[in-house]
Swiss-Prot record:
Signal sequence annotation: 1-39
Organism, scientific name: Bordetella parapertussis (strain 12822 / ATCC BAA-587 / NCTC 13253)
Record gene name: tolB
Main location per the UniProt record: periplasm
Protein known as: Tol-Pal system protein TolB
Compartments (UniProt record): Periplasm
Amino acid sequence: MPAMTPAFRRADLTGFLRTYGAALILLLAAMLAWQPAQAQLRVDISGTGATQYPVAIADFAVDDTHGRALAEVIRADLTRTGQFRLINAADSGLNVDSQVAHDDWRAKGADFLAYGSITRGPDGRYDVRYRLADTVKKGQLDGVAFSGTEQELRRVAHQIADRIYEKITGVRGVFSTRIAYVLKRGSTYELQVADADGQNPQVALRSREPIISPSWSPDGSRLAYVSFESGKPVVYVHTLATSARIPVANFKGNNSAPAWSPDGSQLAVALTRDGLSQIYIVSAGGGSNMRRITRSPGIDTEPNFTPDGRSIIFTSDRSGGPQIYQTGLDGGDARRLTFNGGYNISPRISPDGSTLLYVARRDGAFRIASLNLSSGSETLLTDGRDDQSPSFAPNGMQVLYAAIQNGRSVLAGVSSDRRVRQTLSVLNGEIREPTWGPFTR
């Protein structure tokens, strides 16, 4: 079964669609309960950024156990970016009201110092107060208070790491965002949602057949995906908080490759209802509203809206081999975007609209590439043999994708400048089809 592989991996594209539609049927009953997953992702990191900011993260005072754990999450978040060099802050004795000895910390090599306090209130909730000092300018860069239950402290740590990252780099942090992916364990497939660091995985959907093409809504509350339980591929929209879902594309033939409009009201999808796969727009709330966008003699698939919502990027073989095109929502003439190589698929556009991300076949290997849309310059970001499903972080600084490592499917990440790489894997199972969720605050 050619599940989980791009639609353009075979030379006979029309034959692939016939095979794909016939093979991926009869989905067994899916369990839609929102429940904790049984395994955490393991993260391995290599490389460093071109610039590394020296920062000390002190254990948060008062509640030693929770304060140490809070600081460890913040340190781990910053370390994963490769952009920070951690300065030892063991036994600092700092609390949120401490006077910072800027010169002393500067002498230790720290340009920045994060510190704070955590206390448990009478209602059982924890109050977390944090400060960020600039030891060079000898001033306070940031200071804020949070409140949460014990179960919410990890989220609070991610939010603090986001603030540290943004105050120092000027770019919004993504540590409190989420990722979605498909985990295959034995004969079972699970659509899972986890924190950006791979922790706290939750099962959104479980089935005995493949789940494909998960796509986040702009507000992070819903996932669109393709399911086959009715005997044919159908696009569903799934509300994560309630596990409620509705079919939004249930037409004759294949319904596939959902992608959200920036306002969350519509989905671009690939349908074969009128013959070869073409691009359509349907309502994200269900109903009968549908509009055809492309009308080509080839196969058009893998649509994605541009950030301004005015056009769609998609894959098409109209020129022979699969390439990436852009067309307006009026369905006018499409403009070809990729010209390097004879095989480029799975387009994703950066949050600022400046960079195109895609899978490129180069020297027989499938690698993740980026294209500067202004200059036309292409960069190969990965060096694997079978890298797939690229997805930008919502700040555009990192890329998540599926890779093969030691014969198993894993999630991998690479910084947009190629300098920092990470791998997310599980002890039992294979993970694939990643998609990085949006900012939600």
